[in-house]
């Protein structure tokens, strides 16, 4: 009981917490045989493959991992593996020399050892947050950013190890059913996604959790919305990536560091059917038309829906030249005359979308008959990606957002988190959609929560 309380003090999803708990559990094994047995089970339940020791192309770079896997009790106790894609040295000093011609034998050999873990059911792959897209690879010399090439090589190595583990002859192993990718780069890899390797692994996954990261710009992200990956990836995610997992998924998390779903890329989930989906977590998703959320409403099996910092866009300013390739869905937008809100730029197009959370909440209540748990909140800093159950139930004032393509560093203009006040164009012009819609939004929010509560009983 004491050991169990110790283990619950820290979140088991955080690698730093795992290492902290492990420091306390190691001496507990010395108390008696019973404590040794209990502590061992907790100690090795989650294993972390991290770059440790001297990373010089040989096995010493993964000494901790390899020593742990040499212990039979550890191999049998492991249920989850966290794989760190690169070392702190690589992130700080841009040392990527271990990856040569797409090969890093010490790392890939360490990854392959998951075949020796008969009881794991979950894999987490943690990339670094910074990444470079195609344009930066050609024009910018930043070496402290994890390259897209090594990211893909790591992803392939993990998938290959999962597949090889599943088809080992004369060996009974659990099926790896949960896949978490932290900081997956928003770069389409169609050849890999269309490969037999990808599909062989995807067919067994029933819990998929993705946090997407995007182009890192050392000089500021004010032009990042023009990078081609921001235009391409969401369509790729909808049409190629997710369909490979759709049949068996019971839980899905789609979270981006940046606002997504509306522009420059567009995601409306059209054609996506998840017949077994029970839990859906969305982070930073922006609704921009009256049918934008229909893909969620069509998942009739949903029992839990969590919206973490999701918004409805209110006012939009785009540049006709810079955004002409964007797949803008203007059908529910009202065009505003030039000069509105003090915006007189020659290429500026101004729009307003009158969508409300009142309408969205009512649709959720009426279209998801099995929904029992609904969460709606705004993150304070980082997304609740690894801890979705911490998402609250708050009708926060910043639930509406504006978009101004001419504003930096980000074109997404979030509302004041306390008052809901919004800015657009001339900063002497202000608006407050949360106040305008407060009565209707609050009524629909209460009705939705009440319906979920009744279904629990």
Give the ranges of each region predicted by the language model.
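Leucine-rich tandem repeat or coiled-coil scaffolds
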Residues: 80, 87-97, 116-124, 129-153, ...
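Leucine-rich solenoid repeat modules
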Residues: 9, 49, 275-457
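Short regulatory "switch" loops immediately downstream of catalytic or recognition motifs
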Residues: 4-14, 24, 51, 86-90, ...
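Hydrophobic regular-secondary-structure patch
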Residues: 1-102
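Leucine-rich repeat
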Residues: 34, 40-45, 58-67, 72-80, 88-274, 288-294, ...
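A structural signal for well-ordered alpha-helical segments within the folded catalytic domains
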Residues: 29, 33, 105-108, 118, ...
């Amino acid at each position: 009981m004491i050991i169990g309380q110790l283990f619950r003090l820290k979140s088991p999803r955080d690698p730093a917490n795992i290492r902290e708990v492990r420091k306390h559990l190691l001496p507990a094994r010395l108390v008696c045989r019973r404590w040794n047995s209990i502590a061992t089970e907790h100690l090795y339940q989650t294993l972390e493959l991290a770059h440790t020791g001297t990373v010089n192309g040989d096995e010493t770079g993964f000494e901790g991992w390899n020593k742990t896997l040499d212990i039979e009790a550890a191999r049998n106790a492991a249920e989850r593996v966290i794989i760190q894609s690169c070392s702190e040295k690589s992130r700080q000093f841009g040392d990527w020399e271990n990856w040569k011609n797409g090969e890093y034998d010490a790392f890939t050999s360490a990854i392959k050892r998951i075949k020796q873990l008969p009881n794991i059911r979950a894999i987490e792959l943690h990339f670094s947050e910074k990444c470079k897209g195609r344009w930066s690879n050609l024009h910018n010399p930043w070496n402290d950013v994890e390259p897209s090439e090594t990211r893909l090589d790591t992803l392939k190595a993990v998938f290959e190890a999962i597949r090889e583990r599943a088809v080992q002859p004369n060996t009974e192993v659990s099926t790896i059913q949960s896949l978490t990718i932290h900081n997956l780069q928003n770069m389409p890899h169609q050849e890999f996604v269309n490969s037999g390797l990808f599909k062989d692994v995807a067919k067994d996954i029933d819990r998929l959790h993705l946090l997407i990261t995007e182009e890192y710009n050392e000089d500021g992200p004010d032009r990042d919305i023009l990078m081609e990956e921001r235009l391409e990836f969401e369509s790729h995610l909808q049409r190629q990536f997710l369909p490979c997992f759709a049949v068996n998924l019971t839980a899905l998390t789609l979270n981006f560091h940046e606002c997504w779903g509306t522009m420059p890329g567009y995601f409306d989930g059209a054609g996506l059917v998840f017949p077994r989906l029970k839990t859906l977590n969305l982070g930073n998703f922006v609704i921009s038309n009256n049918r934008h959320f229909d893909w969620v409403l069509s998942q009739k099996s949903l029992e839990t829906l969590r919206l973490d910092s999701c918004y409805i866009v209110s006012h939009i300013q785009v540049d006709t030249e810079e955004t002409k390739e964007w797949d803008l869905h203007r059908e529910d937008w009202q065009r505003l005359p030039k000069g509105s809100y003090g915006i007189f730029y020659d290429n500026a197009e101004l729009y307003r979308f009158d969508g409300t959370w009142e309408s969205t909440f009512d649709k959720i209540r009426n279209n998801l008959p099995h929904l029992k748990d609904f969460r709606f909140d705004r993150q304070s800093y980082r997304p609740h990606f690894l801890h979705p159950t911490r998402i609250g139930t708050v009708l926060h004032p910043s639930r509406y957002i504006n978009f101004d393509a001419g504003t930096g560093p980000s074109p997404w203009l979030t509302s004041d988190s306390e008052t809901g006040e919004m800015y657009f164009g001339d900063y002497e012009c202000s608006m407050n959609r949360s106040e305008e819609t407060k009565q209707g939004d609050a009524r629909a929010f209460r009705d939705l929560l009440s319906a979920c509560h009744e279904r629990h009983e």
